[in-house]
Amino acid sequence: MKFSLISSCVALAVLVLSTEAAPNGKKVNIPLTKNKDYKPNAKNAIQKVLAKYHRHRSTSSSSNSTSTDGIGRVPVTDYYNDIEYFGQVKVGTPGVTLKLDFDTGSSDLWFASSLCTNCGYSQTKYNPNQSRTYAKDGRAWSISYGDGSSASGILGTDTVVLGGLTIQRQTIELARREASSFQNGPSDGLLGLGFNSITTVRGVKTPVDNLISQGLISNPVFGVYLGKESNGGGGEYIFGGYDSSKFKGSLTTIPVDNSNGWYGVTIRGASIGRSRVAGSFEAILDTGTSLLVLPNDVARSVASAYGARDNYDGTFSISCDTSRFQPLVFTIGSSTFEVPADSLVYEQNGYSCIAGFGYGDYDFAIFDDVFLKNNYVVFNPTVPQVQIATVA
């Protein structure tokens, strides 16, 4: 989950899907657009991801028109140097358009509301009294993170339009209070794409659950393309299919361990050039995190190979000249997938640079936007599995 300052965004043209996007099925597209003004902060990014997964450990043992083909395509905004992405979603009748952080590492759908006493001035606030399709739920929700940030409010149900597909009676979480880190963020809230076992309120169906159960998509997958700033930024989420023009070669199918509510996969090894720097470890595919977070021992091996220096805050300083770097290569399933040299720098401060990888105090990795902007992923929550290919 990521929050930061927002500026202007540029719409991304909707792209035509190939026939492979969703055989015999419906799909919707949510494009991503670009914002050049946000400045990254690696230390804050590490603190957010550590807090996010500590929280789960402790609590668990835009298209505005109606889609006629059932394909949901949603564009997303790409922040400065691919740091963050968000998409637009309509909630209510008449609908209010909200900018939401799409996050496969969580499962709640929550956003600022008119009931909020301290939500950010620039945030768009959903008003339940102005929606004809809103219904009260009566239950409360609250999210607290290890860094002290939090949000809380009440539950309700309403119509949610995702890439032109209309979800009926979707449970929504209306924020009544939120921490300053959310108030000053670029988005109005968060749309969780993880499994429903980690929703804050048990038994709540996620938007993906409802897309499937309400028959809005017949192919129960969503494809994720996160554009790189060097290629114009932007990107898109496609619900009900994927866009084969966005990747090279064929998709590699990887089984998913969803026992903790996440898209967990096994990384068989990591290498830089001809040097193997790590053996097998587990990883979570998380579109809501902006820094590649590795297990401590793996991170230090990778840092050593690149001559990076530990900053003792979860980040590494690295040379700003990436032209001499070889890509960081991960073996997943029967294939290898790269994080190229130009993605190894996350943040530049004068003559010093912060690496696009860091470390955490747990034994699994968080494969974030640094990995995902270089590799196309199709998520299938029903099998469960993911399919991965190198971006075109």
Swiss-Prot record:
InterPro entries: Aspartic_peptidase_A1 (IPR001461), Aspartic_peptidase_AS (IPR001969), PEPTIDASE_A1 (IPR033121), Peptidase_aspartic_dom_sf (IPR021109)
GO terms of molecular function: aspartic-type endopeptidase activity
EC number annotated for this UniProt entry: 3.4.23.21
Signal peptide start and end residues: 1-21
PROSITE patterns: ASP_PROTEASE, PEPTIDASE_A1
Catalytic activity: Hydrolysis of proteins with broad specificity similar to that of pepsin A, preferring hydrophobic residues at P1 and P1'. Clots milk and activates trypsinogen. Does not cleave 4-Gln-|-His-5, but does cleave 10-His-|-Leu-11 and 12-Val-|-Glu-13 in B chain of insulin
Annotated TM spans: none
Coiled coil: none
Annotated S-S bridges: C116-C119, C320-C353
Span of domain Peptidase A1: 85-389
Enzyme class label: hydrolase
Propeptide position ranges: 22-69
Top-level taxon: Eukaryota
Residues annotated as the enzyme's active site: D103, D286
Keyword tags: Aspartyl protease, Disulfide bond, Hydrolase, Protease, Signal, Zymogen
GO biological process, one term: proteolysis
Protein family according to the UniProt entry: Belongs to the peptidase A1 family.
Protein name: Rhizopuspepsin-5
Lineage: Eukaryota, Fungi, Fungi incertae sedis, Mucoromycota, Mucoromycotina
